[in-house]
Structure formats: C-alpha cells, structure tokens
Amino acid sequence: MEMTSAFTLNVRLDNIAVITIDVPGEKMNTLKAEFASQVRAIIKQLRENKELRGVVFVSAKPDNFIAGADINMIGNCKTAQEAEALARQGQQLMAEIHALPIPVIAAIHGACLGGGLELALACHGRVCTDDPKTVLGLPEVQLGLLPGSGGTQRLPRLIGVSTALEMILTGKQLRAKQALKLGLVDDVVPHSILLEVAVELAKKDRPSSRPLPVRERILAGPLGRALLFKMVGKKTEHKTQGNYPATERILEVVETGLAQGTSSGYDAEARAFGELAMTPQSQALRSIFFASTDVKKDPGSDAPPAPLNSVGILGGGLMGGGIAYVTACKAGLPVRIKDINPQGINHALKYSWDQLEGKVRRRHLKASERDKQLALISGTTDYRGFAHRDLIIEAVFENLELKQQMVAEVEQNSAAHTIFASNTSSLPIGDIAAHATRPEQVIGLHFFSPVEKMPLVEIIPHAGTSAQTIATTVKLAKKQGKTPIVVRDKAGFYVNRILAPYINEAIRMLTEGERVEHIDAALVKFGFPVGPIQLLDEVGIDTGTKIIPVLEAAYGERFSAPANVVSSILNDDRKGRKNGRGFYLYGQKGRKSKKQVDPAIYPLIGAQGQGRLSAPQVAERCVMLMLNEAVRCVDEQVIRSVRDGDIGAVFGIGFPPFLGGPFRYIDSLGAGEVVAIMQRLATQYGSRFTPCERLVEMGARGESFWKTTATDLQ
C-alpha cells in the first residue's frame, strides 16, 4: 500500500486499484496545487502495473467526496498568468486521469463540487449514493470564476449543452436522482454498497457514453447552437445586468469548445479562468465566501453554549410559522408553538406542511421523512409543554407592553435555564427585558422574511445579557442553517438601520418626480435583487415603514421620511403585495402574479412622475446614504467588525455581492472619493448627505477598512 498525504493507493486482490481521498486534518476534501505531484506519482504506478483491471476514486470523509478546489490558491496568484497556469495544471492532471487505459470510476458520497466534479468528469464512469448529502455541481460562477480544470468542456459533451449551461451559469447543484436522469452519473446506490458497485463497474469495459436526447443533439449543431447561445446570452444579461463578467466568459468558452474543438476550448477555459481571477468582482465574491465561512465559525462569545434539546415559539403568524419550520426541519429540534388562536397554530403547521410537501413533489424528500419532520412540531393555546424548553422565541405583534408580558409569562411557565429570544425588528431588547427576573437570559433574535429563504439573523444582546445566552442563541441560529451576526442593542440594530435611509431616499425621489419603475430599475442595474420601492411592497408598506419613527426619534431628522407620503399611502389602504396594492398593483395569483405600477400613486403623493435623473444618479443617492450609515454603525460598535457589516448587508438586504459589501465597496472607491461624492450631494440635496466624521478622517488619511487580502481586516 502506497501512502501519500491526501491520496492512498490500495490494490485489491481482484486487481482493482482504490484511490482513497482524505486530506489530513480537514473536515472537507479540497484540491490543492501541491496534490498534483502526489496524484501523478499514483498515476505512474497505475500505468506500470499491467495486471490492473480498473481504478476507483473514493473519499474517506463521512459526508463529502471533494468539496472543490482550495480557494486560497487563487488568492495567492498575483497575475492572470499565474491563475491561468493553475488552471492548465488542473486540466493536465484531469487529462492524465482520463487517458488511463483501464476504466476509472468515481464513487461519490456527499458534496462533489467544483474541482471535485471536474475530477469525476475526467473519470470514465460515476456512481453516487442516494443520500441527501450527495450533491453535484460547478459553483465557480458564485465566486466570479468558471470551472478551470476542464468542466466547461466535459460537462456539455456528457449531458448536453443546454443542461450544462444551466448548471455552469447558475452554480446549480443536482441531487443524485437528478444527476442520474441527466446522465451525469451511471448509477445511484445506498452508501453501504457504493464501493462494491463502483468496483464492479470498474471491472467492465469503459462505460459507453449515453446518447444525448434529440433536443440536445439539435442544440449541439451549428444552427441550434447559435440560437441557444443567443437566447441564453439575453436571459443571462437580463439576470446579471452585466455586473458579473464570469457569465459572459462561460458562454464564450463553452461555445468555443463546441465550435472549434476541445483543444481550443481548454485553451479558452484556462485563459478566461486566469483573467476572471484578477477581476474585482471575483475578488469581492471570494471575500464574501471567506467572511461567511469565518462568521459560521464564530461562537459569538467566549462562554460555552448551553445544551439545546427543544424550542418554543410564541405566535403562529408568518414569522412564527417560518421559525418553526427552520427549527424543526433544518435544526431537527422539537418545536412547540403557542398561539392564543387555534387558527394561528394551524397556519404555522400548514406553513411547514406546504414547504415539505413541495419538496416531496419535487422528489427532494421522501414522504416518510416529511412526516418525521412534521412530527417535531406541535401546538397549544396555553403553556402546556413549555416547562422544559431550552429556548423560547417570541414572534408576536410589535408592541413593547405585549412583549414584556410575554417575558413575564415565559419566566412563570418555563425552566430556570430557559432563554427568551425576541424576534423584534425595532424595539430595544433592553426595554423588553426591563422587568425580567432573569434579564441575563433575554436576547434579540431577528429573522428576516421569508424566514426559510433569508440566510441572515441578527443576534442582539442587551447590556445585561450573559455570554452563555449569546453563545447558545448563536448555536441555535447555525443549527437553523442561518448566518448569525451579533449586533448592539441600538435602534434599528444594523440591517434595518442602513436600509431605512436607502428606502427613504427612494420615496423622496418619487416625490421629486422620478417614476417608480425608473427608481427600481436603477437599483437593480446597480446590483440589488429588487429595487427599493418593490422591496417595500414585498415586505409590506405598513411593516416596512414602522421602524422609521423609531429611527427618527433615536438619530434625528436624517431618518425623516418625506412629509405625509407614507401616511397618505397607508390611509389609501395600500400595504403592498399582501393586499394586492401598494406602489404596484398585483394580480390574483399570489407571489407569482404579475405586477404593474399603479399610476394613481403619483397624484396620491403629490408627484408628477416626470423624472430628470439618470439611473446612476438615482442609485448614487440611495447607496451613498446606506454606506454613510454603515460606517456610523462601525463607529458606534453596532456591529463588531466590518466583516459582519459586509455579511449583514449582502445576506440581509441583497447588497450586490460582486461589490463585496458596503465596506469593501467604500475601499474600492476610496474613502476620499466617497466623501467627495457625499459632499457634492449634500450641497445639492441637503445635510442628510453630510459624510460622517469617521469617513472624513479615513479619506484624509487614505485609509481603508480591509487589508488587501481577501480574508484579513485592518
């Protein structure tokens, strides 16, 4: 048996070589540049052994095959040429695996992503487990890159160009059955027999390539290909607004390989990989990846977390139902919902049923697993079943007296160790805990709507919250699949505080005559997933504007909304999508209904709807106020670091990921340039644009928030 640091070669008695991948000291297998020589040494031995019948690659990790390439390798490249050389090295290694004269099979269990899937594609056959942990994909586009070790060339030839483009352009991950249906894998088996099935496949002749569906064969021809790339190009441009250069390069590289052959395709792939690695977009996206990984490792405090065996929820509304779902179905914890109205409990239970039933229909979940997860959720109209809950999340109406009453009731009806977590979006946690007998166990846990989709939670300790309460709440959030940031107990916390001036400015521009669709389109073009006016409609105008008076009382008139505009809209019974009318009008088909701007909105707010500003001018006014407020939050220690500030903005409100978050964006512009822009806007539009003191000082000194590397703070 030949040992290497990450690869073990074992030749079985039946002359099948099993190469076990196990990167020492790491939970996940990732490919590193230094492994190339190790793999080549093994390939040399395989070629020298004339008795071998086949080869199987398998992972020793319990839940991943290969999670991708080590992203630090890209960060270490100083030039496009260095990154291109890295890609060519990967391509060459995969080519050597593919060129082995005997069948090579990948036995896949767990994540098989990026470079891991490229290695599997270089094999002659693939078998994977039917485990939910098994996913296959090429997520490089999410880091502003493209697959650089042959993925753009091998995948289209294996599963067809249109399906391959969808995977590569979106980073979409396939489950086992989807992969089998598309021909990405040759078999799906239980984990217990994975290796034996792969070995048997390796004993046969090389698996012949499955004939592509007729549609894919047509699209691979010159006419079909031209039409496909034109259509996909238009769709991609509309989705990315031209902000992500990787998607354009992916289309170019895949088309080059199909039109000019694999040699030209591999060459184009390596060159594009090198160039994309040096783009500011890729650097920003990689910084978000590193920051989010870092946040997920952050325990929140130095104290050890308390055990978490069960959770209670007060309120069965939209938020309560969503929190119950992620607690039971993601965290796997028993949940007890209390609502004074049985209909509230039914609503919360139906919410989880709808989510899980959708997964069953899409064949992502077995019906038996759905029933098992639903069995974790129960309901009550009183406090029966709450006596031993470790943590109780309050998701009732946004009213201070009511929330204080909830604290008192929970303390009377739960254990001495029970934590009370409030899902408030605006009320100070210190005020909610004001009359608590155990204030050290009261904390804020702010989810964003819709709960099952939004990745961020804000965890808000008040001055008296214990370190263990913080650590335990952070632990729960991670179990729920969330990315938690710990923020200070100040009005608006972090996300809503930086969002409010952004939305206020959009409303102000409406009153000045800019059109709803122009404002929204300008911010989508800038890189936000939706514009500020549409966002307000989606959240609910009544809900979204409730925080403005709270912020105005705390921080003064820079948070003032345009006079009487919000009240005029609410008095006209406009709440947004939830009641079918806001700034937009909605059809009758729920969230998927088409919307159109309601022209009646302009006279209602006393505006003409005849704008004069360009899209960049509109975006500049909204975004600069957000940046200024984010810097104030650092200065006032509302957030613990600019890392948390960037993650909070990207994951909480969809700040453009390709800009890396507010603080990376300020660094890319230069603090001095941001100050100059804000001073110009202050002269034009008023003192709300006055740059904060910290920004002015940083601009004068030429300072930045981040160091030059993707992972370190100054």
UniProtKB/Swiss-Prot annotation:
Site note Important for catalytic activity, residues: E118, E140
Statement: the UniProt record of this protein carries the keyword S-adenosyl-L-methionine: no
PROSITE patterns for this protein: 3HCDH
Pathway participation: Lipid metabolism; fatty acid beta-oxidation
Subcellular location: Cytoplasm
Keyword field contains Transmembrane: no
Keywords: Cytoplasm, Fatty acid metabolism, Isomerase, Lipid degradation, Lipid metabolism, Lyase, Multifunctional enzyme, NAD, Oxidoreductase
Predominant subcellular localization, coarse grouping: cytoplasm
Catalytic activity reported: a (3S)-3-hydroxyacyl-CoA = a (2E)-enoyl-CoA + H2O; a 4-saturated-(3S)-3-hydroxyacyl-CoA = a (3E)-enoyl-CoA + H2O; a (3S)-3-hydroxyacyl-CoA + NAD(+) = a 3-oxoacyl-CoA + NADH + H(+); (3S)-3-hydroxybutanoyl-CoA = (3R)-3-hydroxybutanoyl-CoA
EC number: 4.2.1.17, 5.1.2.3, 1.1.1.35
Record region (Enoyl-CoA hydratase): 1-190
Pfam families: 3HCDH (PF00725), 3HCDH_N (PF02737), ECH_1 (PF00378)
Highest taxon listed in the record's lineage: Bacteria
Function: Catalyzes the formation of a hydroxyacyl-CoA by addition of water on enoyl-CoA. Also exhibits 3-hydroxyacyl-CoA epimerase and 3-hydroxyacyl-CoA dehydrogenase activities.
Subunit and partners: Heterotetramer of two alpha chains (FadJ) and two beta chains (FadI).
HAMAP family (UniProt xref): FadJ (MF_01617)
Protein name: Fatty acid oxidation complex subunit alpha
Lineage: Bacteria, Pseudomonadati, Pseudomonadota, Gammaproteobacteria, Enterobacterales
